Amino acid sequence: MALPVYYDKDIDLGVIQSLQVGIIGYGVQGEAQALNLRDSKVKVRIGLYQGSLSVSKAKKEGFEVLGVKELVQQSDVIMALLPDELHKEVLEKEVIPFLKEGQIIGFAHGFSVHFNQVVLPKGVGAILVAPKGPGSALREEYLKNRGLYHLIAIEQESSIHNAKAVALSYAKAMGGGRMGVLETSFKEECESDLFGEQAVLCGGLEAIVRMGFETLIKAGYPEELAYFECVHEVKLVADLLHYKGVEGLRKHISNTAEFGAIKAREPMGNLLEKRMQKILKKIQNGAFAKDFLLEKSLNYPRLNTERKALKETKIEQIGEILRAPFNHKK
Protein backbone atom coordinates (compact mmCIF):
# COMPACT_ATOMS: atom_id res chain seq x y z
CA MET A 1 0.00 0.00 0.00
CA ALA A 2 1.39 3.40 -1.01
CA LEU A 3 1.91 5.92 1.77
CA PRO A 4 0.62 9.50 1.41
CA VAL A 5 3.48 11.81 0.35
CA TYR A 6 3.65 15.56 0.92
CA TYR A 7 5.99 18.13 -0.62
CA ASP A 8 6.82 21.76 0.11
CA LYS A 9 3.92 22.98 -2.02
CA ASP A 10 1.48 20.95 0.10
CA ILE A 11 2.67 22.18 3.51
CA ASP A 12 2.20 25.44 5.40
CA LEU A 13 5.50 26.45 7.00
CA GLY A 14 3.67 29.17 8.90
CA VAL A 15 2.16 26.60 11.26
CA ILE A 16 5.45 25.78 12.97
CA GLN A 17 6.73 29.35 12.60
CA SER A 18 3.82 30.53 14.76
CA LEU A 19 4.77 28.19 17.62
CA GLN A 20 7.59 28.03 20.15
CA VAL A 21 9.65 24.87 19.71
CA GLY A 22 11.72 23.34 22.48
CA ILE A 23 14.26 20.62 21.74
CA ILE A 24 15.37 18.35 24.57
CA GLY A 25 18.89 17.16 23.84
CA TYR A 26 21.69 18.62 21.74
CA GLY A 27 23.44 15.63 20.24
CA VAL A 28 24.06 15.24 16.52
CA GLN A 29 20.34 14.99 15.71
CA GLY A 30 19.27 17.71 18.14
CA GLU A 31 21.87 20.14 16.84
CA ALA A 32 20.98 19.53 13.19
CA GLN A 33 17.26 19.90 13.81
CA ALA A 34 17.70 23.08 15.84
CA LEU A 35 19.91 24.69 13.20
CA ASN A 36 17.59 23.77 10.34
CA LEU A 37 14.54 25.02 12.22
CA ARG A 38 16.22 28.32 13.06
CA ASP A 39 17.28 28.81 9.44
CA SER A 40 13.63 28.23 8.50
CA LYS A 41 12.63 31.13 10.79
CA VAL A 42 11.25 28.90 13.56
CA LYS A 43 11.60 29.99 17.21
CA VAL A 44 13.77 27.35 18.93
CA ARG A 45 15.09 26.87 22.45
CA ILE A 46 17.20 24.01 23.80
CA GLY A 47 16.51 22.07 27.00
CA LEU A 48 19.48 20.52 28.82
CA TYR A 49 20.42 19.46 32.32
CA GLN A 50 22.69 21.58 34.46
CA GLY A 51 26.22 20.37 33.88
CA SER A 52 25.52 18.96 30.43
CA LEU A 53 28.57 19.11 28.19
CA SER A 54 26.31 20.35 25.39
CA VAL A 55 25.31 23.58 27.15
CA SER A 56 28.36 25.55 26.04
CA LYS A 57 28.09 24.25 22.48
CA ALA A 58 24.42 25.19 22.15
CA LYS A 59 25.05 28.64 23.61
CA LYS A 60 28.05 29.16 21.34
CA GLU A 61 25.81 28.47 18.36
CA GLY A 62 23.44 31.16 19.56
CA PHE A 63 20.64 29.17 21.20
CA GLU A 64 18.92 30.01 24.44
CA VAL A 65 19.41 27.07 26.81
CA LEU A 66 16.91 26.30 29.57
CA GLY A 67 16.43 23.52 32.08
CA VAL A 68 14.19 20.74 30.80
CA LYS A 69 11.29 21.57 33.13
CA GLU A 70 11.49 25.26 32.24
CA LEU A 71 11.66 24.44 28.53
CA VAL A 72 8.51 22.32 28.72
CA GLN A 73 6.61 25.08 30.49
CA GLN A 74 7.59 27.65 27.85
CA SER A 75 7.09 25.64 24.63
CA ASP A 76 4.17 24.79 22.36
CA VAL A 77 6.00 21.89 20.71
CA ILE A 78 8.56 19.81 22.61
CA MET A 79 10.83 17.45 20.67
CA ALA A 80 12.35 14.64 22.74
CA LEU A 81 15.64 13.99 20.96
CA LEU A 82 17.15 11.69 23.57
CA PRO A 83 18.29 8.05 23.34
CA ASP A 84 15.26 5.73 23.28
CA GLU A 85 16.12 4.02 26.55
CA LEU A 86 16.18 7.33 28.45
CA HIS A 87 12.71 8.48 27.44
CA LYS A 88 10.82 6.81 30.27
CA GLU A 89 13.12 8.10 33.01
CA VAL A 90 13.48 11.64 31.69
CA LEU A 91 9.97 12.23 30.40
CA GLU A 92 8.21 10.84 33.47
CA LYS A 93 10.22 13.08 35.81
CA GLU A 94 10.95 16.21 33.82
CA VAL A 95 8.36 16.48 31.04
CA ILE A 96 5.00 14.76 31.52
CA PRO A 97 4.17 16.31 34.94
CA PHE A 98 4.54 19.79 33.44
CA LEU A 99 2.71 19.30 30.15
CA LYS A 100 -0.41 21.37 29.58
CA GLU A 101 -3.41 20.42 27.49
CA GLY A 102 -2.90 21.54 23.90
CA GLN A 103 0.87 21.16 23.85
CA ILE A 104 2.50 18.74 21.42
CA ILE A 105 5.39 16.41 22.16
CA GLY A 106 7.37 15.00 19.27
CA PHE A 107 9.67 12.04 18.73
CA ALA A 108 12.19 11.09 16.06
CA HIS A 109 11.57 7.37 16.61
CA GLY A 110 8.45 5.53 17.74
CA PHE A 111 10.14 3.18 20.24
CA SER A 112 9.12 4.70 23.58
CA VAL A 113 5.53 5.42 22.57
CA HIS A 114 4.89 2.17 20.71
CA PHE A 115 6.32 0.03 23.52
CA ASN A 116 4.42 1.98 26.19
CA GLN A 117 7.43 3.52 27.85
CA VAL A 118 5.70 6.87 27.67
CA VAL A 119 2.01 7.48 28.44
CA LEU A 120 0.86 11.01 27.66
CA PRO A 121 -2.00 12.99 29.21
CA LYS A 122 -5.19 13.47 27.22
CA GLY A 123 -5.27 16.62 25.15
CA VAL A 124 -1.51 16.56 24.59
CA GLY A 125 -0.57 15.82 21.00
CA ALA A 126 1.99 13.13 20.18
CA ILE A 127 3.73 13.30 16.81
CA LEU A 128 6.56 11.52 15.06
CA VAL A 129 8.90 13.42 12.76
CA ALA A 130 11.67 11.08 11.63
CA PRO A 131 14.35 12.19 9.16
CA LYS A 132 15.62 9.19 7.20
CA GLY A 133 19.27 9.81 7.85
CA PRO A 134 21.76 10.91 10.52
CA GLY A 135 21.94 14.44 11.84
CA SER A 136 25.05 15.24 9.83
CA ALA A 137 23.28 14.40 6.56
CA LEU A 138 20.15 16.27 7.66
CA ARG A 139 22.16 19.46 8.09
CA GLU A 140 24.35 19.00 5.02
CA GLU A 141 21.40 18.40 2.69
CA TYR A 142 19.50 21.37 4.10
CA LEU A 143 22.46 23.69 3.45
CA LYS A 144 22.60 22.43 -0.15
CA ASN A 145 18.93 23.39 -0.56
CA ARG A 146 18.05 19.71 -0.63
CA GLY A 147 16.63 17.47 2.05
CA LEU A 148 16.13 13.98 3.41
CA TYR A 149 12.96 11.95 3.23
CA HIS A 150 10.95 12.34 6.43
CA LEU A 151 8.32 10.14 8.06
CA ILE A 152 5.51 11.62 10.14
CA ALA A 153 2.88 9.94 12.30
CA ILE A 154 0.20 11.02 14.74
CA GLU A 155 -0.37 8.96 17.88
CA GLN A 156 -2.53 11.42 19.79
CA GLU A 157 -4.30 14.65 18.84
CA SER A 158 -3.75 17.98 20.58
CA SER A 159 -6.80 19.70 22.01
CA ILE A 160 -5.65 23.02 20.52
CA HIS A 161 -3.36 22.47 17.55
CA ASN A 162 -3.79 20.20 14.53
CA ALA A 163 -1.09 17.61 15.21
CA LYS A 164 -0.73 16.53 11.59
CA ALA A 165 -0.37 20.11 10.37
CA VAL A 166 2.30 20.71 13.02
CA ALA A 167 4.19 17.52 12.11
CA LEU A 168 4.14 18.37 8.40
CA SER A 169 5.23 21.95 9.03
CA TYR A 170 8.05 20.81 11.32
CA ALA A 171 9.25 18.36 8.66
CA LYS A 172 9.16 21.09 6.02
CA ALA A 173 11.22 23.39 8.25
CA MET A 174 13.91 20.70 8.37
CA GLY A 175 13.99 20.36 4.58
CA GLY A 176 11.85 17.24 4.36
CA GLY A 177 9.34 18.72 1.94
CA ARG A 178 12.05 19.19 -0.66
CA MET A 179 12.41 15.42 -0.92
CA GLY A 180 9.10 14.09 0.39
CA VAL A 181 7.29 13.64 3.70
CA LEU A 182 5.56 10.27 4.04
CA GLU A 183 2.75 9.62 6.53
CA THR A 184 2.86 6.37 8.49
CA SER A 185 2.15 5.22 12.07
CA PHE A 186 4.30 4.97 15.21
CA LYS A 187 3.96 1.16 15.03
CA GLU A 188 5.03 0.84 11.41
CA GLU A 189 7.94 3.26 11.75
CA CYS A 190 9.21 1.69 14.95
CA GLU A 191 9.02 -1.95 13.90
CA SER A 192 10.34 -1.44 10.37
CA ASP A 193 13.19 0.76 11.62
CA LEU A 194 14.27 -1.79 14.23
CA PHE A 195 14.03 -4.60 11.69
CA GLY A 196 16.11 -2.71 9.14
CA GLU A 197 18.80 -2.01 11.73
CA GLN A 198 18.94 -5.57 13.01
CA ALA A 199 18.40 -7.70 9.93
CA VAL A 200 20.08 -5.61 7.25
CA LEU A 201 21.83 -2.30 7.91
CA CYS A 202 23.69 -3.00 11.15
CA GLY A 203 23.27 -6.57 12.36
CA GLY A 204 22.91 -8.33 9.03
CA LEU A 205 25.58 -6.39 7.20
CA GLU A 206 28.07 -6.67 10.04
CA ALA A 207 27.47 -10.41 10.35
CA ILE A 208 28.00 -11.02 6.63
CA VAL A 209 31.08 -8.81 6.51
CA ARG A 210 32.71 -10.43 9.53
CA MET A 211 31.83 -13.98 8.49
CA GLY A 212 33.15 -13.36 4.99
CA PHE A 213 36.39 -11.94 6.36
CA GLU A 214 36.87 -14.85 8.78
CA THR A 215 36.07 -17.43 6.09
CA LEU A 216 38.87 -16.13 3.86
CA ILE A 217 41.33 -15.83 6.76
CA LYS A 218 40.67 -19.41 7.90
CA ALA A 219 41.20 -20.59 4.32
CA GLY A 220 44.67 -19.02 4.32
CA TYR A 221 44.09 -15.79 2.40
CA PRO A 222 45.95 -12.62 3.45
CA GLU A 223 44.13 -10.36 5.88
CA GLU A 224 44.56 -7.38 3.56
CA LEU A 225 42.79 -9.13 0.67
CA ALA A 226 40.04 -10.41 2.96
CA TYR A 227 39.46 -6.88 4.21
CA PHE A 228 39.37 -5.35 0.73
CA GLU A 229 36.94 -7.94 -0.63
CA CYS A 230 34.61 -8.19 2.36
CA VAL A 231 34.72 -4.75 3.99
CA HIS A 232 36.34 -2.00 1.95
CA GLU A 233 34.30 -2.53 -1.21
CA VAL A 234 30.96 -2.53 0.61
CA LYS A 235 30.80 1.24 0.13
CA LEU A 236 31.01 0.88 -3.65
CA VAL A 237 28.05 -1.48 -3.69
CA ALA A 238 26.09 0.54 -1.12
CA ASP A 239 26.49 3.71 -3.18
CA LEU A 240 25.24 1.92 -6.30
CA LEU A 241 22.23 0.56 -4.40
CA HIS A 242 21.49 4.00 -2.97
CA TYR A 243 21.57 5.85 -6.26
CA LYS A 244 20.69 3.16 -8.82
CA GLY A 245 18.64 0.50 -7.00
CA VAL A 246 19.07 -3.28 -7.32
CA GLU A 247 18.65 -3.33 -11.10
CA GLY A 248 21.08 -0.44 -11.48
CA LEU A 249 23.61 -2.27 -9.32
CA ARG A 250 23.32 -5.32 -11.55
CA LYS A 251 23.98 -3.17 -14.62
CA HIS A 252 27.17 -1.80 -13.11
CA ILE A 253 28.84 -5.08 -12.16
CA SER A 254 30.45 -7.73 -14.35
CA ASN A 255 28.63 -10.78 -15.67
CA THR A 256 30.86 -12.87 -13.43
CA ALA A 257 29.79 -10.92 -10.35
CA GLU A 258 26.11 -10.95 -11.31
CA PHE A 259 26.02 -14.69 -12.05
CA GLY A 260 27.94 -15.39 -8.84
CA ALA A 261 25.45 -13.32 -6.86
CA ILE A 262 22.53 -15.30 -8.28
CA LYS A 263 24.20 -18.64 -7.52
CA ALA A 264 25.09 -17.57 -3.96
CA ARG A 265 21.59 -16.31 -3.28
CA GLU A 266 20.03 -19.72 -3.86
CA PRO A 267 21.50 -21.55 -0.82
CA MET A 268 21.44 -18.44 1.39
CA GLY A 269 17.93 -17.21 0.59
CA ASN A 270 15.79 -19.67 2.54
CA LEU A 271 18.04 -19.56 5.59
CA LEU A 272 18.07 -15.76 5.64
CA GLU A 273 14.31 -15.52 5.26
CA LYS A 274 13.70 -17.79 8.26
CA ARG A 275 16.20 -15.88 10.40
CA MET A 276 14.70 -12.55 9.39
CA GLN A 277 11.19 -13.72 10.23
CA LYS A 278 12.39 -14.61 13.74
CA ILE A 279 14.00 -11.20 14.14
CA LEU A 280 10.80 -9.45 13.04
CA LYS A 281 8.67 -11.58 15.36
CA LYS A 282 10.78 -10.63 18.39
CA ILE A 283 10.41 -6.98 17.47
CA GLN A 284 6.65 -7.24 16.97
CA ASN A 285 5.95 -9.11 20.21
CA GLY A 286 8.06 -6.75 22.31
CA ALA A 287 10.77 -9.29 23.20
CA PHE A 288 13.56 -7.16 21.75
CA ALA A 289 12.35 -4.02 23.54
CA LYS A 290 12.22 -5.95 26.82
CA ASP A 291 15.76 -7.26 26.32
CA PHE A 292 17.09 -3.84 25.38
CA LEU A 293 15.53 -2.07 28.36
CA LEU A 294 16.88 -4.78 30.67
CA GLU A 295 20.33 -4.25 29.15
CA LYS A 296 20.03 -0.54 29.94
CA SER A 297 18.89 -1.20 33.52
CA LEU A 298 22.02 -3.34 34.08
CA ASN A 299 24.25 -0.57 32.66
CA TYR A 300 24.82 -2.20 29.27
CA PRO A 301 26.96 -5.24 30.20
CA ARG A 302 26.66 -6.98 26.83
CA LEU A 303 27.23 -3.81 24.81
CA ASN A 304 30.32 -2.97 26.85
CA THR A 305 31.71 -6.50 26.50
CA GLU A 306 31.07 -6.56 22.74
CA ARG A 307 32.64 -3.14 22.21
CA LYS A 308 35.78 -4.11 24.10
CA ALA A 309 36.10 -7.45 22.31
CA LEU A 310 35.62 -5.89 18.87
CA LYS A 311 38.77 -3.80 19.25
CA GLU A 312 40.81 -7.00 19.56
CA THR A 313 39.52 -8.69 16.40
CA LYS A 314 41.66 -9.15 13.30
CA ILE A 315 39.12 -7.35 11.14
CA GLU A 316 39.50 -4.20 13.25
CA GLN A 317 43.27 -4.44 13.59
CA ILE A 318 43.95 -4.75 9.85
CA GLY A 319 41.13 -2.33 9.13
CA GLU A 320 42.71 0.37 11.27
CA ILE A 321 45.90 0.09 9.24
CA LEU A 322 44.17 0.13 5.85
CA ARG A 323 41.82 2.98 6.80
CA ALA A 324 44.67 5.19 8.03
CA PRO A 325 45.30 6.95 4.68
CA PHE A 326 41.61 7.88 4.40
CA ASN A 327 41.52 9.23 7.95
CA HIS A 328 44.75 11.13 7.38
CA LYS A 329 43.23 12.93 4.38
CA LYS A 330 40.41 14.21 6.58
Curated annotation (Swiss-Prot):
Binding of substrate, residues: 254
This protein's encoding gene: ilvC
DNA-binding is among the record's keywords: no
Cofactor, how bound (note): Binds 2 magnesium ions per subunit.
One example of a Gene Ontology biological process annotation: isoleucine biosynthetic process
Binding site for Mg(2+) 2: 193, 229, 233
The species this protein was found in: Helicobacter pylori (strain J99 / ATCC 700824)
Taxonomic path: Bacteria, Pseudomonadati, Campylobacterota, Epsilonproteobacteria, Campylobacterales
Protein name: Ketol-acid reductoisomerase (NADP(+))
UniProt entry keywords in alphabetical sequence: Amino-acid biosynthesis, Branched-chain amino acid biosynthesis, Magnesium, Metal-binding, NADP, Oxidoreductase
Pathway(s) where this gene product acts: Amino-acid biosynthesis; L-isoleucine biosynthesis; L-isoleucine from 2-oxobutanoate: step 2/4; Amino-acid biosynthesis; L-valine biosynthesis; L-valine from pyruvate: step 2/4
Domain spans labelled KARI C-terminal knotted: 185-329
